[in-house]
Amino acid sequence: MAELQQLRVQEAVESMVKSLERENIRKMQGLMFRCSASCCEDSQASMKQVHQCIERCHVPLAQAQALVTSELEKFQDRLARCTMHCNDKAKDSIDAGSKELQVKQQLDSCVTKCVDDHMHLIPTMTKKMKEALLSIGK
């Protein structure tokens, strides 16, 4: 049961990341490469100046990648805390003498609720990241 829930979240997050990559990150990569190429075309610039120019071109993409990584880590941490709470409740129930089957059902139900709650956060998280990526790209 938990594996099925994990797969649900994984597929939703992968879909979100693909969408961000296709609609936002890819455009930023194109800008970065074109910007870097123009740095190399300046025949009057020193090697150091060209290097600094290229570094400046990479900044927005690096910021975008850091933003996406940070948001995904926060999401993953929240989901992990929720499922850890479910595990703690299950352990407490076993310690209190509850039947194993009953505890397993409670655990599955709790984990499913965690996943459902976090699946609802994905559209808002996606919107927030897209807005942030657009502001980085400006």
Swiss-Prot record:
**Superkingdom of the source?**
Eukaryota
Residues bearing N-acetylalanine are 2
Q: Is Transmembrane given among the entry's keywords? A: no
> Which UniProt keywords are listed?
Acetylation, Phosphoprotein
Q: Does the keyword Transcription regulation apply?
A: no
Can you quote a single GO CC term? cytoplasm
Name positions with the PTM Phosphothreonine. Answer: 124, 126
- Note the PANTHER family from the entry: PROTEIN FAM136A (PTHR21096:SF0)
Question: Which family does the record assign?
Answer: Belongs to the FAM136 family.
Q: What is the protein name stated in its UniProt record?
A: Protein FAM136A
Give the species. Answer: Homo sapiens
Q: Which gene encodes it?
A: FAM136A
